[in-house]
Design a protein with these regions (language model features):
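Active-site-proximal, substrate-binding regions of enzyme catalytic domains
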Residues: 2-92, 99, 110
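Long, charge-dense
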Residues: 113-117
């Protein structure tokens, strides 16, 4: 099953549209960085794990990459940079609707898609 790394905004947008069950019914595995989940999603969207959202951990090299991205790019948040680094670490596409994160992913040669693909 194809792994896709998501930022928080994609999941929140799909929740607002009432599309989360359909999302997790697709033949993909969805993950977010664990720190992003705990800081941005757990309190109000903790049930996402029950729907099938996975949590990904950055290894040492991935953490270094994430902090490098925070220094290198102005627009993406720290948690966005964790998602970017996790996509690189796992060698899989990144899902985001954030323009700054999309541009950073493109500069890092990481395949990036949006809500509507």
């Amino acid at each position: 099953m194809q792994l896709l790394i998501s930022d928080a905004n994609i999941l929140i947008d799909l929740e607002e549209g009432g599309l989360l069950r359909q999302l997790f019914g697709l033949p993909y595995e969805f993950r977010v960085p664990d720190i992003l989940f705990y800081e941005e999603l757990e309190d109000q969207h903790g049930y996402l794990v029950d729907l099938g959202l996975g949590l990904g951990e950055l290894d040492e090299k991935g953490m270094r990459a994430a902090f490098e991205y925070t220094r290198k790019y102005n627009g993406p948040s720290r948690n966005d940079c964790f998602a970017l680094a996790l996509a690189r670490q796992e060698r899989c596409p990144l899902l985001t609707g954030d323009k700054a994160l999309r541009k950073a992913a493109e500069r890092e040669a990481i395949l990036v898609n949006g809500t509507l693909w």
